[in-house]
Amino acid sequence: MPKQDSLWLKSLRWIQKHLVHTIVVPQDPFADLNLDTSRPLAYVMKTESLSDIAALSEVTEKLGLPSPYEPLVVNGVVAPRVVCLQGRKPLFGERAGNEPFLECFMRLLAVHKERPELDIQLVPVSLYWGRTPGKEDDTMKAAVLERENPTWLRKCFMILFLGRHNFVQFSNAVSLRYMADEHGTDMGIAHKLARVARVHFRRQRKVMTGPLLPNRQALFDSLLKSESLRKAIQEEAVSKKISETQSRETAIEYLDEIAANYSDSLVRIAERFLTWLWNKLYSGINIKGAEHIRQLHHDGHEIVYVPCHRSHMDYLLLSYILYYQGMVPPHIAAGINLNFWPAGPLFRRGGAFFIRRSFNGNKLYTAVFREYLDQLFAKGYSVEYFSEGGRSRTGRLLAPKTGMIAMTMNSVLRGIERPVTLVPVYLGYDHVMEVATYHKELSGKKKQKESVWQVFGAIRKLGNFGQGYVNFGEPITLQTFLNEMAPNWRAELADDPEQKPTWLTPAVNVLANRVMTRINDAAAASSVTLTSLALLASEQNALERCLLERQLDLYLTLLKRVPYTSFTSVAEGDGKHLVQQGIDLNKFSVSSDPLGEIVSIDANQAISMTYYRNNIIHLFIIPSLIASCLTHNEQSQRQQIVAIVNDFYPLLKAELFMGIKDIPSYVNQVLDLFIEQGLITESDNLSVVTEHSSQLVLLSGSVSETLQRYAIIFNLLAHRPKMERSELESESHLLAQRLGALHGITAPEFYDKKLYGTLSVKLKELGYLSDKDDKSDVKRIRDQANSLLRASVRQTIVASVTAEHIS
C-alpha cells in the first residue's frame, strides 16, 4: 500500500474529496457497535482497493478512529491496519492467487498467545459504490459497472457515476482474544476467520442492495404459470361465463394494477429530494433499534415491517430511514386511493404495490394478490404494510385489519423456508400536517379524495415540524409464533394441505393484537407529546411555567426509572428544555404577569393537541390511575390499588394495546417511585404529601376521561343487567355526548363509536355482558369508577342512567 503522504495518494484523496459523498452505516459506530477506543483495532475488508481505503480514511478521520494508513504496532509486532481478503483485480486476467491476509491473521493471533491481556478488535468494513441490486436479465450495464469484483478501470467509472452514493458500513467487532482463547492460534483458525469474513461480506451485500430485480413482464408470466393462479383463472371463466383468455386478461390487468416497478435510479433521486425535505421539515429524526433489524436481515430473515399509520409521510420516512441504515427500502402495500398521477407512478417505482380497500369476494383478485405477495416473500424482498388499514384520526392506534397479516401467515403455511419476521414500528412526529383535516373529518366533514392538488397544498404549508421518531419494536418470527399457538401445525398441514386449520383465524387475531401492542411498546415520549399530556390534564389547559417544568421532570423520571418497556424512547433533557422546545415549535402559548409566565394551549388548538397526547397516553395511564386512587382516598393501601388497577386493566389493554405483563410489580414500582420523589408517604397506609399533591392531581387528570367512559358503561350495565351489546354501545355513545356537552369534554376519542364497540366486545369476553344473575363484579367496578370521578361528573352520569330515557 502506498504511504499516506505519497503524491499518488494525495492526488487520489483530492479527487475523491470532490467526487465522493460517503454515508456511514451505522451513523454512530461507537454507540451502535460498542467499539472500545482503549483497545487496539484493525479493519477487515473484502478486496484491496486504493479508492476504498481512501474513502475509509476520510470516514475514520471524522469518527476519531485509527487511520487505515497507520500500521498496527503491538508488542513490537508491526501489522497492516487493514487486512484485505483478496488483492486488486488487474485490468486483464485474474488476480494473484496468494493469500497474504492469512499471514496477517497469524501474526495478530500469535501476539495474543504471547500477551494474555491483549484483545485486538477486528472490525469488518464494507464499501459500496451505489446500491443497485442488478436485474435478473442484466447485460451491458452489469459489465460496465460490475460491483463485486471491479477492475481499476471499472472502479473509475463507479466513482465517477456513483461516487455521491458511497456507503461505508462498519460491523460488530470480532474479539481476537476470544478467538485465540476458544479456538487457538494456528493456521486453521486463520482460515476459519477468512471463511467467516467472506460469508459475512456476502450477506452484508445482500442486506445493503437486496435481491436481483425481476423484469416486470417476466414476473407476470411467471405468476400466471403458477398452479393456484391458473386454477383461479379457470374458476373465474366458469363463474363469469367468459373464455379463459378473457379471464387471463383480467388477471393481467389486476397484476398491472397491483405490482410495484422498483427503480434504483428513482430511489437515488428520491434520496436526494428526501434529504432536502427532511432537513427543511425536521430538526432531527430519532431512531432506535435499527441495529437489531439489520442483524435479522443479515441472518436471512424475510422482514415484514408493520408500522403505525399517522400520516402520508409514513410511506417516505420509514423507507428513507431504512436506506440510510444500510437496508433496502421495502415493497410497500399502499391503498389504491394513492394511485393517482403523478404520485402513483412515482410510488410504484419507489417500491409501492397497490391494494384495494376491499376485495368484495373477488376470488380472482384475491388469488392474484396472494400470489404476488408470495412471490415477494419467495424472492427475498422486504415488505411493509399498515395493519390499521388507514391513518389514525385521534392519535391512538386503530383496531387492526387482519387481511394482510392473514395473507402473510398463509404464505408461511404454504412453505416459506426462511424465517418470516414481523417488525412492529412506531412512527411519531412533533407535527402531523394532516391533524387539522383529521378533526374536520371527525366532526362530520367528508374525507377529500387524494389528488395532485392536495400534494401541492401540503408542500405549500411546509415549515418547522420539529423532530421525527422511528422506533423498531420487538420482532415476531411467525414460525416461532405458530409453534406457540399450534405446536403441531407442520404435521397438520402435511396431512391435509387444502384444509384451513380451525386455529388459524384465532391465531391471526392474536398476532394482529400482539403487533399493535408491540408498536405501542416502542412509543417515543417527546417534548410535544409530554407537554400536551400535562397541559391537557389541567383545568384550563394552562399551567405556571415552573409547575409545568416540574411536572415534566416527574414524567421523565417515571419513564426512565420505571420504564414501560426497553423499546420505549424518552426525550433527552429536563422539563425546562422540553417546554422550550414546544414553545419554539409554536405548539404552546406563553403569557406573563407579575407573578411569572403561564404556558397554555390556545382554545382553538386544544382538540388538535389531544392527537399528540394520545400517541403516548398508554405510557401514563396506569401511573395516572394510581395517582387518581391516591388523591381520591385519604388512606390507601397497596393491595387496594393493585386490585383496582387489575379490574380496569383488561379494558385499558383492549383499547390502548398495552402489554404490561406483571401488574402488581409495575404498580409497586410506581408507588415506590412516588415515595422516593416525596409525593406520598407510607406507614400502615399510603398518604399524599400535601405540598406535592398538585403533581399527583395533575397526573391523575390523564385518566379522567377514560374513567368517565368506564363509569358510563358500568352504570348502564348495573342499572340494566340484561342490556344487549348493541344497545350498550349506542346508549354509552349517547350518554358520552351528553356528558361532553355538560362538562366541556372535547377529546374526539371520547365520542368515538368504534371505541365503545371495542369495549363492548371485551366486556362480553370478560363475562360482564352475560345472562348471569350475579352482577356483583359489575357493581364493584361501577363503584370503583364512580369513586374516582369529580362529584359533578358522577352526578350527571348517575342521574342520566337512572332517568327513564337517556336524551
UniProtKB/Swiss-Prot annotation:
Keywords: Acyltransferase, Cell inner membrane, Cell membrane, Lipid biosynthesis, Lipid metabolism, Membrane, Phospholipid biosynthesis, Phospholipid metabolism, Transferase. SUPFAM superfamilies: Glycerol-3-phosphate (1)-acyltransferase. It comes from the Bacteria. It catalyses: sn-glycerol 3-phosphate + an acyl-CoA = a 1-acyl-sn-glycero-3-phosphate + CoA. One of its GO terms (cellular component) is plasma membrane. A motif (HXXXXD motif) lies at residues 308-313. It is a peripheral membrane protein. The keyword Methyltransferase does not apply. Its main location: membrane. GO terms for biological process: CDP-diacylglycerol biosynthetic process; fatty acid metabolic process. CDD domains: LPLAT_DHAPAT-like. InterPro entries: GPAT/DHAPAT (IPR022284), GPAT/DHAPAT_C (IPR045520), GPAT/DHAPAT_LPLAT (IPR041728), GPAT_PlsB (IPR028354), Plipid/glycerol_acylTrfase (IPR002123). GO terms for molecular function: glycerol-3-phosphate O-acyltransferase activity. Its EC number is 2.3.1.15. The keyword Transferase applies. It is found in: Cell inner membrane. Pathway: Phospholipid metabolism; CDP-diacylglycerol biosynthesis; CDP-diacylglycerol from sn-glycerol 3-phosphate: step 1/3. The HXXXXD motif is essential for acyltransferase activity and may constitute the binding site for the phosphate moiety of the glycerol-3-phosphate. Belongs to the GPAT/DAPAT family. This is Glycerol-3-phosphate acyltransferase. It comes from Shewanella sp. (strain W3-18-1). The lineage of its organism: Bacteria, Pseudomonadati, Pseudomonadota, Gammaproteobacteria, Alteromonadales.
